[in-house]
UniProtKB/Swiss-Prot annotation:
It comes from Pelobacter propionicus (strain DSM 2379 / NBRC 103807 / OttBd1). Its EC number is 2.7.4.22. Allosterically activated by GTP. Inhibited by UTP. Homohexamer. The gene is pyrH. One of its GO terms (cellular component) is cytosol. This is Uridylate kinase.
Length: 239
């Protein structure tokens, strides 16, 4: 078995990644598959934190464009991330992975409050920590929450699981001439408007030199491959 390249990482998943082929909600088979891959990572001694989006349940930005108050819509989106976080906790604990959910919004009956030192202690004890409710503030995406939490826990990289095997010059589903970019500088992502993470999240990573690795989550075994240093996606880092 390969020696892990990283000892502490943050895995960022979109809400849609939990929906599977149904496109909405949470697909039990899909979430179980992801949980098994996470278990394999933990068994290698890697400390892993998670941030999950909420787009499979509710999108605050989309709702605000339809006339809903943006702050209220974003609050609903944060609650959607908590639903996904609790679902992932259940999937992980059913296969024997100790997990803690920490929420940026106080909801003490279902999750711990976000406390940085406590989160780090959980990681040191081999528990998976799931950060829910984004940053706890409207107008900030879960990508930004992932960047913030990754820096707070001193993660060595953000692993962003997507539906494509990296970053392309254009949408490969719409443009047959699109080519994959195996390596990118943060500034190029910002200048070219590439769909890696939103500008705020990318800028945070750039300012703190935190690598972002974009990879295909839909192919089984890819999480462990990235952890072990296989270059299967796109790595975004300093020039």
């Amino acid at each position: 078995m390969s020696r892990p390249k990283f000892t502490r990482v943050l895995l960022k998943l979109s809400g849609e990644s939990l929906a599977g082929s149904q496109g909405y909600g949470i697909d039990p088979k899909t979430i179980t598959t992801i949980a098994r891959e996470i278990k394999e990572v933990v068994q290698q001694g890697v400390q892993l934190a998670l941030v999950i989006g909420g787009g499979n349940i509710f999108r605050g930005l989309a709702a605000s464009s339809q006339g809903m108050d943006r702050a209220g819509a974003d609050n609903m989106g944060m609650l959607a991330t908590m639903i996904n976080s609790l679902a992932m906790q259940d999937a992980l604990e059913k296969i024997g992975v100790a997990t803690r959910v920490q929420s940026a919004i106080v909801m003490q009956q279902v999750a711990e409050p976000y406390i940085r030192r406590r989160a780090i202690r959980h990681l040191e004890k081999g528990r998976v920590v799931i950060f829910g409710a984004g940053t706890g503030n409207p107008y900030f995406t879960t990508d930004t929450a992932a960047s913030l939490r990754a820096m707070e826990i001193s993660a060595q990289a953000i692993l962003k699981g997507t539906k494509v095997d990296g970053v392309y010059t254009a949408d490969p589903k719409k443009d047959a001439t699109a080519t994959k970019l195996p390596r990118l500088a943060y500034i190029d992502v910002l200048k070219r408007g590439l769909q890696v993470m939103d500008a705020t999240a990318t800028s945070l990573c750039m300012d703190n030199n935190l690598p972002i690795i974009v990879f295909d989550l839909t192919t089984e075994g890819n999480i462990i491959k990235v952890i072990n240093g296989e270059e299967i996606g796109t790595i975004v880092q300093g020039e």
